[in-house]
Amino acid sequence: MNFQRATPSVEQGQDPPGLQAVLARVHWVLVNPSHPGNVGATARALKVTGFHQLWQVDSNQALAAQRLLDPQAIAMASGADDLLQKAHHAQSLDQALQPCLLSLAFTARPREFEPPRRSLQQGLKEALDLLRLYPEAPVAMVFGAERAGLTNDELMSCSRVCGLSVNPGFGSLNLSQAVQVVAYFLRHLVMQEGLDEQAKGQGQGQGPSVSGSPPALAPAASVQALYRTLQQLALASGYLDPKEPGRFRDRLQRLASRTQLLEDEAQLLHGLSREILKRLG
């Protein structure tokens, strides 16, 4: 089924350059998808809304590549197989999220330990604000495996948790359908807020001056490095029992996710922790 375009494009079949630039900074991350057809259908859902940064997380790179070449994936992509050909691969979710300033995890199940929970509208608005303030940085939308969804550890690797408003008596939503809903609303928000026009102006040298730029936020890679160092410090100091670490890392992640660390703050805490580790010997 074809729908008439809501906005004019520079060339027939293309979004305006400003809109393309914004949508290119949204990474769509599928964690251990089990069915090739769902990956293909997800590619179609993304292409029809103008997104094209498709990521697969799978420790088995050969299996991930095979999934993209599967006839079911190509058939379900229905013309979006170019997204399958250009799809990115990461060995772990942490690796996939390294450059991202914000990651929204989509799950219906509440957990004991989870990042701050947001409605779909709140989460996408937060992502939109970061896309506006930091015109080079990416954000990520993260979806778990079809049967079990995201694990607790995968969930804690993300910045925020979002759910979709569905029938509580029947909340089962296909992976590609969930992606389609989120992609549509995010595209709509980008256009409604005029972010595509801002990106167009920045591309023509009309962006904000360097002096007016916001402070650099810590990407996921810096935050992950800080978590590792703090855990090493807790072990070296005797504060943490290696045989019973409990939920120490989860608590750290939950604490940090309540705010958005600046890059210099993350480096300060990381450097201080490393120095203490050296002195502990």
Regions found by a protein language model. Give the residues of each.
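Post-transcriptional modification and biogenesis factors for structured RNAs
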Residues: 1-281
